[in-house]
Amino acid sequence: MQLTELSIKSQNKFVQHYIDGENMSSFFDYDIHSEDVWQKRLHDLSSQPFAREELADYLSSYHEKFHSAAMQASIEKLRDPKSAAVVGGQQAGLLTGPLYTIHKIISIIVLARQQEEALQIPVVPIFWVAGEDHDLEEINFVHTSTENKGPVKQKLPQSYWKKTSAAKTELDQEKCAAWIDEVFAAFEETDHTNTLLQNVKRCLRSSETFTDFFELLIADLFQEEGLILMNSGDPGIKKLETGMFQQILKHNHELAKAVSDQQRLMREAGYHPIIESDKDQANLFYEHEGERFLIEKENGVFVIKELDLKWTNDELHTHMEEKPECFSNNVVTRPLMQEFLIPTLAFIAGPGEINYWGELKRAFSLMGFRMTPVVPRLNITILERHIEKKLSERNIPLQEAIEHGTGHLKDTYFEEQIPEEFSSVMEQAKSQIEAVHKRARDEALKVDSSLEPLLQKNAAFIQDQLLFLERTVTKRIEEKEGFVLRDYERIQNSIRPLGAPQERIWNVMYYLNRYGPKFFTTFKHLPFSFQNQHQIVKL
């Protein structure tokens, strides 16, 4: 396995400017390109209070189910008042979700390890599992591929309440086991298949919910790294969050304005906000009979219109004290809750997160925080040996394949195989035959005008015969050049499937099945660097 790098620009202007080190002080509190950024952050953390003992006690209890000494050792480090954490998060996707989830976790672990050594303090990796997220349509599938087909979405055939959180949505064991079999049936059987499949099913049997299944698989993959999993949908953590819920309530109007003002600033700078903010949103969810509902503001009170529920500020404050497990964060308040709970040295962010965190600087300031340094996660493409060989054979630069795919190159190659004169001759034939046929039609209509429909049908039939000739020739070219054309398709499917980055479509199970556990052990210990270069892992 070999690690190389490429310089690939982000298509998001805001993200690229951030990566390039342009002045973004209007959007972020720390300059991640500054040499003393980590010392500054540690200094700021030293004056910020954290309920370290309570957090460690909760996490220690929650992690007992993983039976991991490394996890517990990381949790114990959090009790040290000098310790800090590198944090990142993602939804609880089936079979761990797209590859970028794995890449984000590796980013968290690598940066935590690097900073622990550089700063000589305990730095722990924490992965924030979005268990309170209720958009299950985003996590209930994986993509698979066969030799003759590109990516196919394989969705878990299970019905569920639309607004139930991932942490509380039970998996149908029978349906999920059958679905896993279908996913693995799409893989080529290898020496690793049976062991991997049985391990995945073992994790499933020990799971009740989407989040359980996700966490057990992640804990298994990163069992030696001391990765701490923080499930935002677990009722146990809500007691620790109560104080922040109440602060969000207290400053609710100002919070909505802070986000709106920051988004206006972003637009004025020529960038595009992505958070859908509304001055009537309370930026919190409320759980009622297993479903999540957005709390809104109306005429000075807090309401859930679908349920006809209303609270005054004082009533909601008391309810938060008594039933914190009923409340959860949205895209605006989740980062604030993270800052409240965890002594965060750095936040590992994907491109979309970099954009929307830039919309929250004033929200952080309002709540008395400085936004943690936001570090772009590692962008990784896995280059399999047979794909690298095909790139060389077809003389395709790897950067071209990653940035643009090979579909356009396939089309160009195919067009070049069509005889130069064939297309023009066919167009001439269609035009000339139509001209002659039109004269014949005109003469025939002089005999009987009612022949018009029949004559038009005859003209169309003749043109169809010419199209048949054209299709026959192109089909023969496809058959003749099929081997080469399939090479272009294989490269596209591997490196830029569905026209998207590899990490957004493919799942780690394909690689674990094909290359085995040693592949993953080597992969996660590669010397990745945070130089904002695209990482190429050659197998």
Swiss-Prot record:
Transmembrane domains' residue ranges: none
E.C. number(s) listed in UniProt: 6.-.-.-
Keyword Nucleus in record: no
GO MF assignments: ligase activity
Keywords, ordered alphabetically: Coiled coil, Ligase
InterPro entries: Bacillithiol_biosynth_BshC, CC_BshC, Rossmann-like_BshC
Family indicated by similarity: Belongs to the BshC family.
Name used for this protein in its record: Putative cysteine ligase BshC
Organism field: Bacillus velezensis (strain DSM 23117 / BGSC 10A6 / LMG 26770 / FZB42)
Gene assigned in the entry: bshC
